[in-house]
Amino acid sequence: MINPTKVDVQIKEFSKEQLIDISKDIHKQGVAVFYNQKLNETEYTSVMKKFGECETPNLFMNPKEHPEIFLVTGKKVDGKKIGMFGDTELGWHSNGNSRHLIDKILIALYCVKEDINTTLSVCN
């Protein structure tokens, strides 16, 4: 079982060099959890770009202003899904379906609104 250390820091204040060091630790440990981050979409993508290049496939679940973000939600606007996956349990996962094309990958999740049903499981 992975038991990440709970550290109360704001990653948006880290330099690129500090984030690269963190990514090396993530590679060894398998996961890092940063609680209580106060990031808007621009700050989130700025931090992620310090780690490396972000994927921007421009699909329906990628906001036009921030195509690096993938919305994982069952929420609908005007009757249309705005994010990937279903209306109930989302069951979101990344199984590295394109890992054979790349030599490094980092997945970052940011929970905007947590509730009693919010669960994060990490398997490596």
Locate the predicted segments by residue.
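Non-heme Fe(II) oxygenase catalytic core, chiefly the N-lobe of the double-stranded beta-helix
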Residues: 1-124
